[in-house]
């Protein structure tokens, strides 16, 4: 993965974190230190692991861990959607079409998470190809 692609991945991850934090601020108060915190930590971990993978010479194990943490982030967001937390506005269920609001928010995050996942998989494939050339 080239330097330009890595910068794009950083940028995409930062956009995801901003959007996640915007939506997570509306979760119910009883989830502030539960699922909400798990999602935030997973997003921050993914961002930190991206930086770590960019700096390491041997990237394969870091990229593998990064891929796992990315899947955990995807799973946590899915759990929040299934529990109906994306339908909340200001810690209360939205009065105007909470299901529609939840679906729009989940779709927005899903698209962003999927795009980052495709970029990570491309990076993993490029790194695997690079390592097989060296051997």
Question: What function would you assign to each model-found segment?
Answer:
Residues 1-135:
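Amphipathic alpha-helical assembly/interaction segments
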């Amino acid at each position: 993965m080239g330097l330009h692609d890595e910068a794009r991945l950083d940028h995409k991850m930062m956009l995801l974190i901003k959007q996640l934090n915007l939506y997570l601020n509306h979760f119910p108060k009883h989830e502030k230190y539960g699922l909400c915190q798990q999602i935030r930590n997973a997003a921050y971990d993914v961002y930190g692991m991206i930086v770590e993978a960019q700096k390491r010479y041997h990237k394969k194990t870091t990229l593998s861990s990064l891929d796992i943490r990315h899947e955990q982030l995807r799973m946590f967001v899915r759990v929040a959607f299934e529990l109906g937390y994306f339908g909340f506005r200001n810690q209360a269920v939205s009065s105007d079409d909470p299901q529609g609001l939840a679906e729009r928010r989940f779709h927005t995050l899903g698209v962003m998470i999927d795009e980052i996942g495709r970029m990570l998989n491309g990076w993993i494939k490029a790194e695997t190809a690079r390592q097989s050339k060296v051997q």
